[in-house]
């Protein structure tokens, strides 16, 4: 009986070890996959940079076109880290009619660059870092102010406009994106 119990114990131990070794890689893979966030119907992979991810979001085609027109692809593909408040296509659609078409013209590159770099803060700031009343200095040089209300995060621009963070903490290899529902305007 003792010999049979020993064999049974050894078999159970082997089964546990084998099942653990098979499950561990799957769990690690699932954990890496769970770090991805869906934005605009596309997975945003933490192993890719801001530009590599943004080009796949159907909600950010206007932003991507503007980044290309402003010549900021190289910068936002760089090492960073950056915190980007990324306006959706709907956010750009809230601007007066014709604004985006005017901004992407070569003669307006400086203005477009000013607006886009106003959405970028040096360093990686997670949602938990965006505390109520916190002032952020953008790459453009002006300030943004964080407001929290009802569990939501709002970013207030220099003109008093408020943009709500709709998808926080979209991690990138060179920073983090927070999707916002309005375009932020510098002073």
Where are these regions (language model features)?
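Mature, structured domains of secreted/extracytosolic soluble proteins
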Residues: 6, 24-187
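Bacterial N-terminal signal peptides that target proteins for export
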Residues: 1-12
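Bacterial N-terminal signal peptides
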Residues: 10-21
């Amino acid at each position: 009986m003792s010999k049979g119990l020993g064999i049974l114990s050894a078999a159970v131990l082997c089964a546990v070890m084998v099942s653990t070794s098979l499950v561990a890689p799957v769990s690690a893979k699932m954990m890496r996959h769970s770090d991805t966030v869906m934005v605009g119907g596309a997975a945003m992979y933490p192993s890719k940079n801001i530009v590599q991810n943004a080009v796949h979001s159907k909600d950010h085609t206007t932003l991507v076109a503007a980044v290309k027109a402003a010549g900021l692809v190289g910068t936002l593909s760089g090492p960073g880290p950056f915190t980007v408040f990324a306006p959706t296509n709907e956010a750009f659609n809230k601007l007066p009619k014709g604004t985006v078409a005017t901004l992407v013209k070569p003669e307006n590159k400086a203005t477009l660059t000013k607006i886009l770099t106003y959405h970028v803060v040096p360093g990686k700031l997670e949602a938990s870092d965006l505390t109520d009343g916190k002032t952020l200095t953008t790459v453009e040089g002006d300030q943004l102010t964080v407001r929290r209300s009802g569990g939501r995060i709002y970013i207030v621009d220099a003109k008093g406009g408020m943009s709500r963070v709709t998808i926080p903490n979209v991690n990138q290899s060179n920073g983090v994106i927070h999707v916002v529902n309005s375009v932020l305007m510098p002073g």
